[in-house]
């Protein structure tokens, strides 16, 4: 018998007008997955929560960003090594310097070229490679 799948989650690819992607540096806490690693913002669905609502909530809770559901565009939902992940993208229309984090150490914009050289947490490198090349 195989193990039960992990919890479902969401992640959001936030893209600025120059085509750069906002990544979040995770806390440097050894008790969390991928400590001190750059990742896409996101989190786990709460019981009964729709994925798009989770994406809105996570961006508000972790970064103080108010992104309406209509501004989120579904990219893919796929089983990953840790559970079912729903990926969305949205245009980023704020200066990252104004983002006040409640989780993580920092946020920063990265070009597609920079992202291609990075080791990201979870399986975010694969997700971004597919997204940035239109796959």
What are these regions (language model features)?
Residues 1-22, 41, 75:
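Conserved N-terminal beta-strand and adjoining loop/helix that marks the start
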Residues 20-61:
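Conserved Nudix-box catalytic region and its N-terminal flanking loop in Nudix hydrolases
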Residues 99-131:
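NUDIX/MutT-family hydrolases
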Residues 2-6, 30-33, 76-87:
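Acidic pyrophosphate-coordinating catalytic loop
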Residues 66-75:
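A short coil-to-beta-strand element that immediately follows conserved catalytic motifs
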Residues 16, 76-98, 108, 130-131:
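Active-site-adjacent beta-strand/loop module that shapes the phosphate/pyrophosphate-binding cleft
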């Amino acid at each position: 018998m195989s193990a039960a799948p992990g919890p479902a989650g969401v992640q959001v690819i936030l893209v600025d007008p120059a085509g750069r992607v906002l990544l979040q540096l995770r806390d440097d806490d050894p008790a969390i997955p991928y400590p001190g690693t750059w990742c896409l913002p996101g989190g786990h669905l709460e019981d009964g929560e729709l994925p798009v609502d989770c994406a809105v909530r996570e961006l508000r809770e972790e970064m103080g960003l108010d992104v309406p559901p209509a501004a989120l565009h579904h990219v893919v939902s796929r089983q990953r090594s840790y559970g079912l992940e729903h990926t969305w993208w949205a245009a980023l229309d704020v200066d990252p310097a104004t983002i006040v984090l409640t989780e993580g150490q920092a946020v920063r914009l990265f070009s597609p070229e920079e992202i291609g050289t990075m080791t990201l947490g979870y399986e975010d490198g694969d997700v971004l490679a597919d997204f940035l090349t239109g796959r």
